[in-house]
Amino acid sequence: MLYFCLLLVLLLPNNGVSSEASCARMDVPVMQRIAQGLCTSSCTAQKCMTGICKKVDSHPTCFCGGCSNANDVSLDTLISQLPHN
């Protein structure tokens, strides 16, 4: 149930959730798969094929792959490109 609630929060459009939030617990063994799943789901919601948690300057960051630009791009970058209401 917790996973489902977190997933709903991350899939809401333009909710201000950073890529660090979806991958924040990637170093905790039990939470590793959940963090990866949240990253992938967030990227899929941004019309990318997949997502992966990586460390950038010791900060966990969600990178989306298989997007229209064919490059890996951080989730934060994709969210910042969304039209603002």
Curated annotation (Swiss-Prot):
Residues 1-19 form the signal peptide. Gene3D superfamilies: Antibacterial factor-related peptide. The keyword Signal applies. Expressed in the pharynx and body wall muscle. Keywords: Secreted, Signal. GO terms for biological process: defense response to other organism. The lineage of its organism: Eukaryota, Metazoa, Ecdysozoa, Nematoda, Chromadorea. One of its GO terms (cellular component) is extracellular region. This is Antibacterial factor-related peptide 1. Its main location: secreted. It is found in: Secreted. It holds the Pfam family Antimicrobial25. The keyword Glycoprotein does not apply. It comes from Caenorhabditis elegans.
